[in-house]
Amino acid sequence: MFAVATAGVLAAATVPQLTTGVERARTSGAARYLAGRLAFARSQAVARSANVALAFAADGNTFTVAMYADGNGNGVRTADMSVGVDPLIEKAVRLSDLFPRVVLSLSDPSDTSPATSALMSFSPIGTASSRTLYLRGADGSQYAVRVLGATGRTRVLRYVASTRAWVEVL
């Protein structure tokens, strides 16, 4: 009886730590997933010798992300995407289906009017449109996925609250 009670107390003490670890891993996974999609879009742009973009669109309280290629040589544009001139090359995925309780912001979360859509484009020579995507987990962990336009390089950063600094993790 004593052993069962002790095991119950120990289990109750470790569950919150496990939950925090799961949420942090989920948020980190979401950041790495987006970094991977961005790197893949860049490689597709180079391979196709055409602009390729990831399109982010608000879908309720989450975002979808889809990949489009330039179909007429003028870059990937929302108007061309809607009429099929710029073809869909990877169907839209709801981020909340893959990473529940992870919140994506297309602009700095402190902005008073957050962005609800964005195109992150990559050119055939590997350059990109610069942007930072912000992710926040249910445990408060924060990650950023940053693309440097001149090189198309994608980096994943984690916010360390104790030092108030973003630290590169990938």
What residues fall within each predicted segment?
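N-terminal helix-rich module
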Residues: 1-2, 9, 13-39, 43, ...
